Regions:
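Non-heme di-metal
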Residues: 1-189
Length: 189
């Protein structure tokens, strides 16, 4: 059975997809308020250099924007429209829910505590040609005419964007810095 054709049965056709869903919901589930990021605000505002603070602000801004693209535009948007098999629909709903209802609020919560969560903060990336190009490339990937190319490229970019930014935030726990402990707890989930 094709993943792009709606099934007339609710029998499990793709056990691996069901495993992905269960892992996401049972083993990786947490809430945005579970991690007490307010404990890291002092680190960001006082203990980081201006360059480090700029890097953290840029990372948090792009994470929040990216979660909207990943959860809304991709998983519950394109993927759900094109992959109609029941397990695919469930997976898209689960992945989209995590992006939109856990990750996005988690990053935005930090931004709110830093008093930077406003329209200007979330739109000024367009003034930076590199950041603007990065977000435009994500939109291009999501809207690629070939569904499989879109899926492959989106998965690759999601991994590269997330893990490179995770590495940046995690470096604040290395070499004796011991900063941003709670923000990194959210990443460790």
């Amino acid at each position: 059975m094709s993943l792009t054709v709606e099934s007339t049965s609710f029998n499990l056709q793709y056990p691996i997809i069901k495993e992905f869903i269960n892992t996401q919901l049972e083993k990786c589930y947490w809430t945005a308020n579970e991690v007490k990021v307010e404990k890291d605000i002092h680190d960001v505002l006082v203990n980081l250099t201006p360059a480090e603070r700029h890097g953290v602000f840029t990372t948090l801004k792009l994470f929040t924007l990216y979660e909207v693209r990943a959860g809304g535009d991709y998983w519950t948007g394109r993927f759900m429209r094109e992959f109609k098999q029941h397990e695919c629909q469930e997976m898209a709903a689960a992945f989209g829910m995590v992006e939109l209802c856990i990750h996005k609020p988690f990053y935005n919560k930090i931004n709110e505590l830093l008093n930077i969560s406003n329209a200007e903060f979330y739109t000024d990336y367009v003034k930076n040609p590199t950041l603007k190009a990065r977000m435009e490339s994500i939109d291009t990937i999501i809207n690629h005419p070939n569904s499989l190319v879109s899926l492959a490229c989106f998965s690759l970019v999601e991994g590269m964007v997330l893990y490179s930014n995770f590495a940046y935030l995690k470096h604040f726990q290395s070499n004796g810095k011991n900063k941003l402990l709670n923000i990194n707890r959210g990443i460790n989930y």
